[in-house]
Amino acid sequence: MPVIRTTEKPLGEGNRPDWCKVTSAGIFRVPAANGWFDLHYHDCDEYWLIYKGKAKVMSEGCEYYVKPGDIVCMQTGVEHDVLEVYEDLEAFWFEDATPPGGRTGHLHRDPSKAKKHPVPAKPLPADFPQ
């Protein structure tokens, strides 16, 4: 079984085993100081496994608080984003199989949203789940 060191290079075309159906996988970080992200969607399902930090994210038009141990599940075509962080956020992402004819990477309905935006660092809200 091969080992993909996603800390060095995300799993994707070129280092993905032939039998692997996952389109891509790796680690992303949004630091509390000078963090950036972009509103985007995919032609496949995507999952974020949060392992460090706390943040507010958006998916399906709804806002959610996330913390270590949470899995954010985004269906094909659903726009998602990181809205604000309360501490440095780190997560493992993977994009499920892309269907034939599907596109890979971050897709944007509005070209002006393709540019990353600053993610503000804010104090932890009182209603953040324990």
Positions of PLM-derived features:
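Non-cytosolic beta-sheet module surface loops
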Residues: 39-41, 84
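Short, conserved beta-strand element in jelly-roll/cupin
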Residues: 41-57
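Beta-strand residues in well-ordered beta-sheet regions across diverse protein folds
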Residues: 50-51, 58, 83, 92
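Ligand-binding loop in jelly-roll beta-barrel domains
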Residues: 76-103
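Acidic/histidine-enriched, glycine/proline-rich intrinsically disordered or flexible terminal extensions
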Residues: 101-130
